Amino acid sequence: MKIRPLHDRVIVKRKEVESKSAGGIVLTGTAAGKSTRGEVLAVGNGRILDNGEIKPLDVKVGDIVIFNDGYGVKSEKIDHEEVLIMSESDILAIVEA
């Protein structure tokens, strides 16, 4: 199944969190926590401005992003994989190599 986000929405696949602490201890279960980094899988056409124009999004497919995992982020299962649907405003940063 393909999914195409609308307007300023972005589809993100969460990256796995590192399962070791800084001291080398292996973390399990909730101790490891959920990562707030992910890869952008799809983007909408852009945000609709007050004057009716569409502003293209700053993020693009393939970007690695850091996001706010809060109230506006929706989790969905697509083809047996969990993806997150969020507004571009929920993305805090783009990770550059």
From Swiss-Prot:
Pfam families: Cpn10 (PF00166). It is found in: Cytoplasm. It comes from the Bacteria. One of its GO terms (molecular function) is metal ion binding. Belongs to the GroES chaperonin family. Together with the chaperonin GroEL, plays an essential role in assisting protein folding. The GroEL-GroES system forms a nano-cage that allows encapsulation of the non-native substrate proteins and provides a physical environment optimized to promote and accelerate protein folding. GroES binds to the apical surface of the GroEL ring, thereby capping the opening of the GroEL channel. This is Co-chaperonin GroES. It comes from Yersinia enterocolitica serotype O:8 / biotype 1B (strain NCTC 13174 / 8081). The gene is groES.
